[in-house]
Amino acid sequence: MNRKVTVVGAGNVGATLAQRIADRELADVVLIDIIEGMPQGKGLDIMEATPVEGSDSRVIGTNDYKDTAGSEIVIITAGIARKPGMSRDDLLNTNYQIVKTCTENAAKHSPNAILMVVSNPLDAMCQVAFKVSGFPKRRVFGMAGVLDSARMRTFIAMELGVSVENTHAFVLGGHGDTMVPLPRYSTVSGVPITELLPADRIEAIVKRTAGGGAEIVSLLKTGSAYYAPSASTAEMVAAVLKDKHKVLPCCCYLEGEFGIKDLYVGVPAQLGAVGIEKIWEIKLTDQERATLHKSADAVRELVSIMKL
């Protein structure tokens, strides 16, 4: 492999993501962390699995950003994880400094890279990466909607007893309690779930989707989700590296779309080799639009605290 992807942060999300990228032979992977030995050990462990997986991707772990030079994609997963009782917003001040430093280093060594942000609070951290890197908006975006939509798809499949492959869902807005699941655009084999389920069951699915991350945090007690987040990020990585022109819900910088300006919020976007190719401004009802704006207001409040 010649293509290089850097994963910043060798914690649960970062290491699992590195493994998924290598297993799918999408690129060579550089796993970087400030803790000496951890990225090297995990990188070697993942590399030693590649013969079994039939992958020729190379994986290295490092503490030196020089090893990340020339990456096509840099994925920032670094930051502290949530604990029970914490919201994603509680991570703001600590993760702001972490994401700022990671972005500065990534931009210095890979000035032409696409920056993909996974660290929470997601939408605010995207704003940090965008401002600090100076990259164009198409090359800085975040992973949230793919994960939230995957959770909603899971709950739809469980409710109806169908294959998850038959389900599609769209979740917009901020990656937090104010996210906006859209039942009208959520389907089973093309049929909207509003025609398949009563309102109370749909409401239960929407509520569980919004609390999906917190549910896992409360069960784990010592950390947060990483299997589904890493799988969701890998799907976005594949869409970029394979130039798929794939429409996925991503955290994008809006300049008037959906009536939202100068802010990162989750919306449908087309992903390809250049990053965000296009934002799909789907039609929303007045209520859906108002809910999306409420979600955006919550993100804007967080961003204002950071005084970027």
Predicted feature residues:
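Short glycine-enriched loops at secondary-structure junctions
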Residues: G11, S119-D123, Q270
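Rossmann-like NAD(P)-binding element
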Residues: P51-I114
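NAD(P)+-binding Rossmann beta1-loop-alpha1 motif at the extreme N-terminus of oxidoreductases
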Residues: M1-K42
